[in-house]
């Protein structure tokens, strides 16, 4: 079994490297174009705020995962939003953000809220300063030959050895009527969702859990399909997925920079909602996926699955998720007040999220639009933006 796993990981690493090279080239290209930021009504709205120049020229170290929930990080950089807000930000995209935050190596990070709770309990100087994504929008992706949930029992899956400790897996397994406990599967851990995807593509596993673009990527390349969804996105069941967190030492030492970062975060999300095609282009370059995958991903985040991207803090949703997590023994007791700080949102001059959606998004991209309807509207609004991957 160990030899088989080693061979499997060697194959996956080789395949992932191929995509990684493309992603790396994309990031480099993004850096080369950094001096030619797109001028938009979003950056203009920031200039119209007449923000005072910050005396503190500290460069923020900001981290995010290769998950679509955290797109605001690369949008802030490549759409010129950080620059317009008068802050310098070094953006790093990898799966080690929680560890880096715990070690004090990052000032801010887009992190799953459960990691905030766990970090707080072990003494990590960390707080939730703004929301980023509601609960849900997390998928179980399987190979095309899987037609029933029970076929997954006993299979090799990218769900880790103890999936029962994951809230989204519990929801999806129960919806499919299959066992939650990891002992019923051959669960493997991976270093990234991209690696999980490559394992499915090369036939090494039968399924995995991930966020987009690695669900849409599987369907785009016909490698697999989205089989189940954690749908705690809105309404009475709304949960919490990931947030923009701050290292409290950084926030204490550089309060004005921290507040300006929160403003930039909100403006990046506004950009995604109102400039979806341009946002998708930035997304696809930074994440190393085809443009078509980036566009479909942005559609899901902003219309298809609801208004999932948000900076609005929802204490009730966070409490609901914590109650579920603590009841299952994911971590010890912690309260909302201990890990959430509303002061940064209040003091950073962000727009009211609900008002923004009502006035700037609903009239153009109402919920309920099909992908084709939404894309047609987006093309009309952004006629000069590319919507197809360039042929080489």
Which residues are covered by each model-predicted region?
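Hydrophobic core
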Residues: 13, 17-21
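Short, glycine-/small- and polar/acidic-enriched structural segments
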Residues: 35-192, 206-212, 223-228, 237-238, ...
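Short, solvent-exposed loop/beta-turn-alpha elements that line the ligand-binding surface or hinge
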Residues: 84, 154, 232-237, 304-315
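Pocket-lining segment of extracytoplasmic ligand-binding domains
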Residues: 114-115, 195-287
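Secondary-structure end/capping motifs
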Residues: 254-335
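Conserved C-terminal helix/tail region of periplasmic/extracytoplasmic solute-binding proteins
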Residues: 326-392
């Amino acid at each position: 079994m160990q030899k088989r796993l080693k061979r499997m990981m060697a194959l996956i690493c080789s395949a992932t490297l191929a995509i990684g090279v493309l992603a790396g080239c994309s990031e480099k290209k993004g850096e080369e174009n950094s001096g030619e930021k797109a001028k938009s009504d979003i950056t203009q709205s920031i200039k119209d705020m007449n923000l005072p120049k910050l005396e503190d020229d500290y460069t923020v170290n900001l981290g995010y995962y290769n998950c679509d929930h955290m797109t605001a990080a690369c949008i802030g950089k490549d759409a010129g939003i950080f620059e317009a807000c008068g802050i310098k930000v070094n953006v790093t995209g990898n799966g080690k953000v929680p560890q880096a935050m715990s070690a004090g190596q990052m000032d801010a990070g887009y992190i799953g809220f459960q990691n905030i709770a766990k970090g707080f309990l072990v003494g990590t100087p960390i707080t939730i300063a703004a929301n980023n994504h509601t609960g849900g929008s997390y998928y179980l992706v399987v190979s095309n030959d899987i037609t029933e949930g029970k076929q997954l029992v006993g299979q090799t899956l990218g769900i880790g050895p103890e999936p029962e400790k994951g809230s989204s897996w519990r929801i999806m397994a129960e919806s499919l009527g299959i066992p939650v406990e990891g002992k019923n599967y051959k669960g493997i851990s991976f270093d990234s969702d991209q690696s999980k995807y490559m394992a499915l593509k090369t036939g090494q596993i039968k399924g995995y859990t991930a966020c987009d673009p690695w669900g849409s990527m599987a369907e785009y390349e016909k490698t697999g399909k989205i089989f189940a969804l954690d749908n705690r996105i809105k309404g009475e069941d709304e949960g919490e997925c990931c947030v923009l967190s701050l290292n409290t030492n950084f926030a204490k030492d550089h309060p004005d920079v921290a507040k300006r970062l929160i403003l930039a975060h909100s403006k990046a999300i506004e950009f995604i909602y109102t400039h979806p095609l341009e946002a998708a282009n930035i997304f696809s370059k930074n994440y190393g996926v085809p443009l078509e995958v980036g566009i479909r991903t942005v559609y899901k985040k902003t219309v298809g699955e609801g208004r999932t991207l948000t900076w609005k803090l929802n204490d009730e949703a966070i409490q609901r998720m914590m109650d579920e997590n603590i009841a299952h023994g994911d971590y010890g007791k912690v309260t909302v007040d201990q890990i959430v700080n509303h002061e940064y949102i209040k003091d950073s001059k962000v727009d009211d999220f609900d008002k923004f959606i009502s006035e700037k998004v609903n009239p153009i991209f109402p919920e309920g639009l099909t992908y084709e309807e939404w894309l047609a509207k987006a093309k009309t609004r952004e006629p000069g933006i590319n919507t197809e991957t360039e042929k080489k």
